[in-house]
Curated annotation (Swiss-Prot):
Entry-linked InterPro entries: UCP032146 (IPR008321)
NCBIfam families listed in its UniProt record: PRK02853.1
Domain of life assignment: Bacteria
Name this protein carries in UniProt: UPF0262 protein Sala_0765
Length: 165
């Protein structure tokens, strides 16, 4: 894949499986919109499996959760299926739960806390997000190469797929 044009090694479209999203609220919708916008604007996404026709991007991505697994459905620019990458979600359960808890604290702090308290909670939130992004990069190793910012945005979207009312 190293011979491929780097400008093609990217996601051009992201879709979340609507059946996987069980609950919505305005904060979650805003997080989803921002993550998708930022992801489309700037990302590095390189599936590691070679394809017989040499296809090397750009990619359309659909994320869904099924039977405790995260599924990355990867398609060509024209929408034709390319491959699916499946990850078990067991190792992500705690980071997702912790991230939700710190986000709740952050949203509460915004309403009632001092700037210094908000900054402290925000730093903790960012640290958890960074750790989860690194974990995602490790889990994708050998399957899909992504940069750190892409992994952070993908983790945000994975969280959106796990929100319960």
């Amino acid at each position: 894949m190293s011979d491929a044009d780097p400008s093609l090694q990217r996601i051009i479209s992201v879709e979340l499986d609507e059946g996987s999203i069980v609950w919505r609220n305005p904060d979650v919708e805003q997080e989803r919109r921002v993550a998708i916008f930022d992801l489309i604007e700037e990302n590095r996404f390189v599936p590691q499996r070679g394809h017989p026709d040499g296809y090397a991007g750009p990619y359309r991505l659909k994320l869904r959760v099924e039977d405790g697994r995260l599924i990355f459905e990867i398609a060509r620019e024209d929408g034709s299926p390319l491959e699916a990458v499946i990850l078990g979600l067991g190792r992500f359960r705690r980071p997702i739960r912790d991230y939700f808890a710190i986000c709740d604290s952050y949203y509460q702090a915004i309403k009632t806390s001092t700037a210094q308290q908000i900054e402290t909670v925000d730093m903790a939130r960012r640290a958890l997000h960074n750790e989860a992004a690194e974990m995602l990069m490790d889990r994708l190793d050998g399957k899909i190469a992504v940069d750190f910012d892409t992994a952070r945005r993908l983790f945000t979207l994975i969280c959106v797929l796990h929100i319960k009312g």
